């Protein structure tokens, strides 16, 4: 394998997982903060808020997992290797 392609693949994999984790991380923090605020305002809606929060956290985390899959593909099943 060309050393330039190998190095670029490692850098791209690092960028893929790093950038894929930033957005969901910020979103999960914001969602959790808003859920705690909502629970403080309406404690009787705890079940509905918790269910919605867990579902939205799962969707946000899936974006990070997609970034991990792209990074692993670049590292181990590199389509650019000749």
From Swiss-Prot:
Keyword presence, Nucleotide-binding: no
Gene Ontology cellular-component terms listed: chloroplast thylakoid membrane; proton-transporting ATP synthase complex; proton-transporting two-sector ATPase complex, proton-transporting domain
Q: Which Pfam families match?
A: ATP-synt_C
Give residue numbers for the site Reversibly protonated during proton transport.
Answer: 61
- Assigned keywords, A-Z: ATP synthesis, CF(0), Chloroplast, Hydrogen ion transport, Ion transport, Lipid-binding, Membrane, Plastid, Thylakoid, Transmembrane, Transmembrane helix, Transport
Superkingdom of the organism of origin: Eukaryota
Q: List, in alphabetical order, the Gene Ontology terms for molecular function in this entry.
A: lipid binding; proton-transporting ATP synthase activity, rotational mechanism
Membrane topology field: Multi-pass membrane protein
The record's subcellular location field reads: Plastid, Chloroplast thylakoid membrane
Under InterPro entries, the record lists:
ATP_synth_csu_bac/chlpt, ATP_synth_F0_csu, ATP_synth_F0_csu_DDCD_BS, ATP_synth_F0_csu_sf, ATPase_proteolipid_c-like_dom, F/V-ATP_Csub_sf
User: Mind telling me which residue stretches traverse the membrane in this protein?
Assistant: 7-27, 57-77
What HAMAP family would the database entry show? ATP_synth_c_bact
Other remarks?
Answer: In plastids the F-type ATPase is also known as CF(1)CF(0).
Tell me the protein family, please: Belongs to the ATPase C chain family.
The record describes its quaternary structure and partners as:
F-type ATPases have 2 components, F(1) - the catalytic core - and F(0) - the membrane proton channel. F(1) has five subunits: alpha(3), beta(3), gamma(1), delta(1), epsilon(1). F(0) has four main subunits: a(1), b(1), b'(1) and c(10-14). The alpha and beta chains form an alternating ring which encloses part of the gamma chain. F(1) is attached to F(0) by a central stalk formed by the gamma and epsilon chains, while a peripheral stalk is formed by the delta, b and b' chains.
The protein's role, per its UniProt record: F(1)F(0) ATP synthase produces ATP from ADP in the presence of a proton or sodium gradient. F-type ATPases consist of two structural domains, F(1) containing the extramembraneous catalytic core and F(0) containing the membrane proton channel, linked together by a central stalk and a peripheral stalk. During catalysis, ATP synthesis in the catalytic domain of F(1) is coupled via a rotary mechanism of the central stalk subunits to proton translocation. Key component of the F(0) channel; it plays a direct role in translocation across the membrane. A homomeric c-ring of between 10-14 subunits forms the central stalk rotor element with the F(1) delta and epsilon subunits.
Q: Under what name is this protein listed?
A: ATP synthase subunit c, chloroplastic
Protein source organism: Ochrosphaera neapolitana
What's the name of its gene?
atpH
């Amino acid at each position: 394998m060309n050393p330039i392609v190998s190095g670029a693949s490692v850098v791209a994999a690092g960028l893929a997982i790093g950038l894929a984790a930033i957005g969901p991380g910020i979103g999960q923090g914001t969602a959790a903060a808003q859920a705690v605020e909502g629970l403080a305002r309406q404690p009787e809606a705890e079940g509905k808020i918790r269910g919605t929060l867990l579902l939205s956290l799962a969707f946000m985390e899936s974006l990070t997992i997609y970034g991990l899959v792209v990074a692993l593909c670049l590292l181990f099943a590199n389509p650019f290797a000749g």
